[in-house]
Amino acid sequence: SNQFDIRIVSDNPITWATSTGTCAADSSCGWYIDLDTEVGEKMVANPILRGGRLIFVTTTPSLEACDAGGSSWLMEIDPYTGGRLNFPVFDLNGDGVFDFNDNLASTDGGTTTYTPVSGKRSKVGILQPPAILAGVGGAGDGGYGGAEAKYSSGTNNAQIDVTIENSGILRAGRKSWMQVK
């Protein structure tokens, strides 16, 4: 099944500087992500900057004191704003195509809004940062770009989490140049 827990980050506007050129101590400049610190969620590995996306894994330890396990989220956001991407990253409906149908639909007051998803919860425990394989087959682009696979080892019985994702603007393949004399 392609069902998994999802996260959506905001796309609030960013204040990069004030008219005085300084920022208050209340973090009024730049962006941050408010992780679920009540349960101890942290980012403990370096993020990956790839194709205009910031890719990272968060980790939440188990609530049981003697349990070495926990859970993780695989997140993909805009590195410049800290907000969600403007295209679907995850194949929510499992049809092998990244398109409009992979956004989260929500209705409020008769108006339906479609929002790209920013993260997915691991089903294999705590994840390591993913190894990324670009140009994987089997997923059409739906006008949003090609597909890539993210492989992360989990703490549950050494299982591997495989996520086929939209690579967005990143185009894999041979890069070449010509020397001009």
Regions found by a protein language model. Name each.
Residues 1-181:
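Beta-propeller fold recognition
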